[in-house]
Amino acid sequence: MEDPQPLPQSELPLCDSLIIWLQTFKTASPCQDVKQLTNGVTMAQVLHQIDVAWFSESWLSRIKDDVGDNWRIKASNLKKVLHGITSYYHEFLGQQISEELIPDLNQITECADPVELGRLLQLILGCAVNCEKKQEHIKNIMTLEESVQHVVMTAIQELMSKEIVISPASDTVGELEQQLKRALEELQEAIAEKEELKQRCQELDMQVTTLQDEKNSLVSENEMMNEKLDQLDGSFDDPNTMVAKKYFHVQLQLEQLQEENYRLEAAKDDYRVHCEELEKQLIEFQHRNDELTSLAEETRALKDEIDVLRATSDKANKLESTVEVYRQKLQDLNDLRKQVKSLQETNMMYMHNTVSLEEELKKANAARAQLETYKRQVQDLHTKLSSESKRADTLAFEMKRLEEKHETLLKEKERLIEQRDTLKETNEELRCSKAQQDHLNQADASATKSYENLAAEIMPVEYREVFIRLQHENKMLRLQQEGTENERIEQLQEQLEQKHRKMNELETEQRLSKERIGELQQQIEDLQKSLQEQGSKSEGESSSKLKQKLEAHMEKLTEVHEELQKKQELIEDLQPDISQNAQKISELEAALQKKDEDMKAMEERYKMYLEKARNVIKTLDPKLNPASAEIMLLRKQLAEKERRIEILESECKVAKLRDYEEKLIVSAWYNKSLAFQKLGMESRLVSGASACKDSVAAAPARSFLAQQRHITNTRRNLSVKVPAAASD
């Protein structure tokens, strides 16, 4: 192998940068350097990711993975990749690759030439830029480094400048190609028929030679028999001798052989006539073949002329486009000169304005710093105010709770005073009853009879004591019940206090959230004003999009307001579920914070996308846009024509196969019939000979005249049987 030539400096970074671009496709096989790409496996996987429909898995399975150092497998893989790329350009994109862009695969496989590999990778880049997923691939290119982006863009421009789009004159070329295809098909048919006729002539010549050999052998046998007849003429006078019998038998055989000879000569004449007809047909086919070859040469010449005219028309179109571009540039130059003069005048005005604006800017920066300090102080004061308001609310709630406790204590004090008074009255009554009972017990036993009425009167006093005791027990039970009820009431009051506390906290949080919403609205209004001021300076499209974003954010804020109002109504309606409402309010605040963060993130993303779009618009030339709608229609028509041509070719192939099968069947039938005729003739000859022998052996006592009559009858029967077999 020859040593590779030194590479130009412009070709080396192309291969390296395209390898970096290939690494963006996550392939199974490595693609770090030139040697890893020489097998063609990674390039095939990249093409499969670019267009799955065209470079399908069946196509990918043709490319062998286990290559090793076998350069033949590498070359076959690279040929398959290059063939797939050219067919994709020609059939799917409707473009022709110029010969300058086609790489030398032998240099890639043998020498690992990065220049030729760079050309092949450049064609893959063209497939990626012109496919259906081209926007994704362009975004991937924009994520690369600036130097790599520059090299990739130059490679794309090189491809665009050297691509040849198929012109509308391709219809006439298609018709000529169809005529050429038809002529070639007829030529192939004529050649096939010629070969068949040659084979048939050879077969007939072989048959003629065999028949001539048989004839010569029969003639020689005839001569031998004649000689024997001459020798045995004397012995034929006596019919009873064995020689006479043999003579008659040989004479019969001779007559049969003569008849067969006549029949073979007739068949020979037929074959000769048929052979002459076939030779005439062969001459006609040769003339037709010559005419078709001349037509094919004319079509090739016309095709070459069409290619030349197409190249000249492309050059003329390019020159016309360049002339129009130069005219537009001249007109733009005159306009630019006028604009330069006006801009120089306005530049002086702007210089004075900038000096004055810089002074104002210094003052504004100082004022802005003061404003920021004031804003921070205001925020600190707001936080302090919110904390103090919360503290005041809690203190007011505790004050209310203490007042309620004071009122309950006063009520309990009054109740205890009433209980004390009742207990004093009961105590006095018990003392009186006890004194009466002691006085009655100290009386004499003799006075019992006289004081029976008094004892009867004292009995109700005991009952009265029992009644008083029962009243006391009843009061004590009531006091116990009231104590249990008071404990329960205290528990309920504690629960109520907790709920009231939560209510106050929720009200304070609601008030603070309202203040926060007001602050957010003020901030949004300030942002709208600043955006309006910036919109007058920036472009119209970006400002309109930012306004749409702001309107969307405003709609979101209104939705949040509506949700807050609904939540307030729910708080007012469902006071016992204050804890759940507090959780919902905290969730809403978290959602608000998330929405604010999402809004900020969306604005930052939007700015990034705008900058990327501007960079892409600056880098890409607007003249290199995809083809117009008319070219797309022409491509569709060409695809439909190609489909029709494929269908017609398949039908033509099927018809040829059917004709060939019919011819084979006819020839086989003809050969089979000849074989059966030969077998029938041989069987009849054998049966006739055996019949003659039997007749001779069975009738030894016949006379000479009877024998002659019998021979003539057998001859007639044989002559009748032989033509019948021929007709069969």
From Swiss-Prot:
Residues forming coiled coils: 168-443, 477-658
A GO molecular-function annotation: actin binding
Tissue: Mainly expressed in testis.
Keywords tagged on the record: Acetylation, Coiled coil, Cytoplasm, Cytoskeleton, Developmental protein, Differentiation, Microtubule, Phosphoprotein, Protein transport, Spermatogenesis, Transport
CDD domains, sorted: HkD_Hook1 (cd22225)
Sufficient for interaction with microtubules: annotated span: 1-555
Listed GO CC annotations: cytoplasm; FHF complex; HOPS complex; microtubule; microtubule cytoskeleton
SUPFAM superfamilies: Hook domain (SSF116907)
Annotated Calponin-homology (CH) domain residues: 12-128
PROSITE patterns, per database record: CH (PS50021)
Pfam family name, one: HOOK
Signal peptide: none
Regions crossing the membrane: none
Subcellular location: Cytoplasm; Cytoplasm, Cytoskeleton
Residues annotated with N-acetylmethionine modification: M1
BP term (GO), one: manchette assembly
Similarity annotation: Belongs to the hook family.
PANTHER family: HOOK PROTEINS, PROTEIN HOOK HOMOLOG 1
Name of the protein described by the UniProt record: Protein Hook homolog 1
